[in-house]
Design a protein with these regions (language model features):
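A general structural signal for well-ordered alpha-helical segments in protein cores
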Residues: 28, 60, 64, 89, ...
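C-terminal alpha-helical cap/extension of soluble enzyme domains
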Residues: 5-16, 34, 38-40, 49, ...
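Short secondary-structure transition/capping segments
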Residues: 55-58, 91, 116-119, 147-149, ...
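Active-site beta->alpha loop and helix N-cap motifs at the rims of alpha/beta catalytic domains
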Residues: 2-144, 154
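Basic, gly/Ser/Thr/Pro-rich low-complexity segments located predominantly at protein N termini
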Residues: 13-15, 26, 52-55, 85-87, ...
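Catalytic alpha/beta core domains of metabolic enzymes, predominantly
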Residues: 128-129, 142-249
Length: 297
């Protein structure tokens, strides 16, 4: 079952750019290979760290195909299919080719600031438009509206193909409420690297990670240890990354993780406007921590 396959550390894949801001497809393939070789349990394509709003439709299609072909069924692939135009999402789900996609990740509608009933009706329309498994994504810091535990549980109970939520509200009480009251066939996945460990101790099944782009082996190990109940060793790894968690987002996402990957010699430190690279002070702080962790820069 796809619920089982989505346990562990998924990675929300970045989009590498060249200096001229064109997509660096060679670097993209290197990233996919790196993640496959270092224990990523799933990949999320065209999510937030991919800078999806800045990509053309042709670029999105090419990225999707290249990643699916490279992964070749070795791990599950989630595809970001979200927005604030419900009708457009429904049309996409009905008309696009989802061969090789194991589930879709669909964010709570942003900017429009719908009511809880509007959020429910949005996901109802999506769930009824596809047989693909759906992972909800609650990230009020970006969308401007929080999907409450009550709404999440209502959706989870009413639609069998809604299999999980990526929770990034930062509200542990809300997340715990979902975990305690969820249907058996519905899982909670952390959407925030920094709270992955504590959330797993409450019953979450893993994370869709940003920092996993740079450190898949260690972050996957932490996640697996926590899921196995080896909290002491998992906590040691969690503490190892505490400072990097903070640096990851101080200048925005994916600027932080792109600086990390650049310091490690893996990609150009390039983003598309309106996003810009981290400040020099942040970049140097990242290099300092990486050196302290004995990671090649």
């Amino acid at each position: 079952m796809i619920q089982t396959k989505l346990k562990g550390m998924g990675v929300a894949l970045i989009t590498p750019f060249k200096e001229d801001e064109s997509v660096d497809y060679d670097a993209l393939i290197r990233m996919v290979d790196y993640l496959l070789q270092h224990n990523a349990d799933s990949l999320c394509v065209l999510g937030t760290p991919a800078e999806t709003p800045t990509l053309t439709e042709e670029e999105k299609k090419t990225i999707k195909k290249m990643v699916i072909d490279r992964v070749n069924g070795r791990i599950p692939i989630l595809l970001g299919v979200g927005g604030n135009n419900t009708r457009a999402i429904v049309e996409t789900l009905k008309n696009d080719d989802f061969t090789g996609v194991d589930a879709i990740l669909s964010v709570v509608p942003y900017y429009n600031k719908p009511s809880q009933e509007g959020i429910y009706q949005h996901y109802k329309a999506i769930a009824e438009a596809t047989e693909l498994p759906i992972v909800l994504y609650n990230v009020p810091g970006r969308t401007g509206v929080n999907m409450t535990a009550e709404t999440t549980l209502r959706i989870a109970r009413d639609f069998n193909n809604v299999i999980a939520i990526k929770e990034a509200s930062g509200n542990i009480t809300q997340m715990d409420d979902i975990i305690k009251n969820k249907p058996e066939n519905f899982n909670v996945i952390s959407g925030d690297d920094g709270i992955t460990f504590p959330l797993i101790t409450l019953g979450a099944v893993g994370v869709i990670s940003v920092i996993g782009n740079a450190f898949p082996r260690e972050f996957s190990r932490m996640t697996r240890l926590a899921l196995q109940g080896d909290f002491a060793n998992a906590l040691t790894i969690h503490h190892k990354f505490t400072e990097l968690f903070n640096l990851l987002f101080v200048d925005g996402n994916p600027a932080g993780v792109k600086s990390m990957l650049n310091a490690m010699g893996m990609i150009e430190n390039k983003l598309r406007l309106p996003l810009v690279p981290t400040r020099i002070t942040t970049f140097e702080a990242i290099r300092k921590v990486l050196n302290e962790l004995n990671i090649k820069c």
